Amino acid sequence: MNEYYEPTLLFRQNAVKKYSPELSPVSSMSSLDLPKSNNSSSSWLLDNHNPKDTEILNKSCSLNRLNIKSNYWKIPDNDMSLTSMALSRQGDSNKSLLGISSANDDSNLFIYELDLAENYLTHNNTISLPNVHAMRWVPQMGNNELSLITGNSKGYAHLVSIPNSNEEGQSAEIVKRFNHRKHLKSINKDPSIASHTSTDITKLNFMDKSMDLLSLYDNNLFLWDINGCDSQVRPKPISISSIPGIVNFDPIPHSSNSVGICGQFGVSLFDTRQPKFSVPSSVMKQANKRKLGANVIRWSPNDDNVFAASHMDGVIRLWDIRKQDYFASLDGHQGKKIISIEWNKNDLFSGGRDGNIVHWDLTSDINEYPKPDITNCGLKEGLNSIKFNPVKNSVEKTINQRQCGTVLPASNTNIVDMCSVSLTSHNEEDVKVLSIDSSSFLGLHSKIFDAVKVNINSEKTYYTDDDISLLLAAQQSSLSTLVNDSTENVTKPLTISRMPTTKITHDVAPPAIPTPASVVPTTPNMSNDTLAEGPDEFVEVGDIIRLKEPKFSFSNYNDSVFSVDSNHDIKSSPSSTTSRGSFGESSSSISTNPTIVEASPISHKRDPSDIFNFKTDFDFGLGLNDYKFDESLVDRSFDRMLSLKTNATNYYSVYSS
């Protein structure tokens, strides 16, 4: 018997240990090799070679889905209060003008040029137009003029003329001003702000193939004629419809009079030629009982009879106007409120307050009629996508459920707005969608089946030196993300990649990506937001930039002028040697020079400690009480790390699934 205490060697099935006296007590403990005949009785163990076991693990942990590529840019909005976005295609090319608005008082309207094919973002202008909550690009009817409609928080919509990027010395100008509050008297409503439930213009859109503008203000739907407003000193709406409980609308494609509306009453069709609208009390009771009140509605671009609507229970339902009920429901946000819905061909994207964007693949059966009997569509990955039978050790399918949703974790906070993108490409599978979130990130998400072209066999059990070199080559970074017209400064975006998961049996981890110690990030100034000379007098510039009205014998708000100064002072990355061709003939920076500058340039430098400083509730309905923020997250390693290197920093990440 030993003179010292020795713990008892416990016996457990499949974990038998043996002791060798000639070795130390630690090194002498080794596992006994189990006979192959005993493997049949160990069904509770995870077997990597068992398709049933790997199917459950891969499906629940999202390990077997396709690659999805995402690019991210940081928008220089100090208060992180982005409200809306709008995209305007430039002819048949893959370049588009992108407008992003904020609820701030100044420097809150950002104009970018986006190259959809190469994923480049070029900053053009920054404009001060206070408290923008909705906007829409005006359709170009055979001219090259760029105009933007914006709606603010005080019931005013502005028609703004945006200078082209190649026009130097030009200023942005407010062409017309549409006063919504003043015209409420015509429908016997009090125009005072105190009597309104909301003073924000929450939605702007144009009727299909026309210049008729629809705007939503305080449960009222306004219809304006943009073409006819030039001859009016004070534009008047064509019609005003009071619709209690209305939240959103969407014009029907290929129709000049019909609009789909949604709200507390559910979903409905509306004819602009009949401005009177009433909801029966029985319909309201049924909508509240079934939780069919809706906040977003979008018509299918390929079928004028089908539309999608997000409802109060966090479920998207597909409706056919030839039926009195929905024919499919899409549940993928776990009851969270859905903020935006976008169609792209027959694909549907939804973004919610959970920070996820769900891609719904409806290509196979959306065009069939009568519609397939699919009453429930769910996610094809994640814990909610599987039903496990422990007796049969197999995955069971839910009856009448079609799993067609793919989750993209796009944001750590919540999605604010989305915009669908169509590429001019021969590849019909090129599907992209833009998003902005409450952390002031702009995301470009691509449905690409070969997002990372790295020829690594997924069945390998180790990385070779060539594989590691190839992985590191795909993770080369660049300090510069915005590009200008100079051939010397065109660089690829900053990239942060996460490769497809492979099994590694060796203890040696792949080497970390070296970071140059000599690189010092700099923050160039944004456009020097200034105000220009008005038609009758100079505009005074104080600490807060505002538009000053010209003095006439009558009160006219249609001639206010302001300017922007575009600064493309973007430097090349010292750590990247790749270059591309220029976007234009000129190698000089694009700029618009103001007439009078009475204020110092506005710098958008920000302190890292203020990145997640939520000072107040957002005016567009995303308050601090809607989610909790952990300050310790600032020190963690995000897939989309915040950067102060440029005015709008680009991130590239691959969600391997």
Curated annotation (Swiss-Prot):
Low complexity: which segments have biased composition?
Answer: 572-592
Q: Which domain of life is it from?
A: Eukaryota
Q: Which GO terms describe its biological process?
A: cell division; cell wall organization
Instruction: State the family named in the UniProt similarity comment for this chain.
Output: Belongs to the WD repeat DSE1 family.
Indicate what this protein is called per its UniProt record: Protein DSE1
SMART domains on file: WD40 (SM00320)
Region (Disordered) location: 565-602
Q: Which UniProt keywords apply?
A: Cell cycle, Cell division, Cell wall biogenesis/degradation, Repeat, WD repeat
What's the stated role of this polypeptide?
Answer: Involved in cell wall metabolism and required for the separation of the mother and daughter cells.
Question: What Gene3D superfamilies does this protein map onto?
Answer: YVTN repeat-like/Quinoprotein amine dehydrogenase (2.130.10.10)
Q: Give the species.
A: Debaryomyces hansenii (strain ATCC 36239 / CBS 767 / BCRC 21394 / JCM 1990 / NBRC 0083 / IGC 2968)
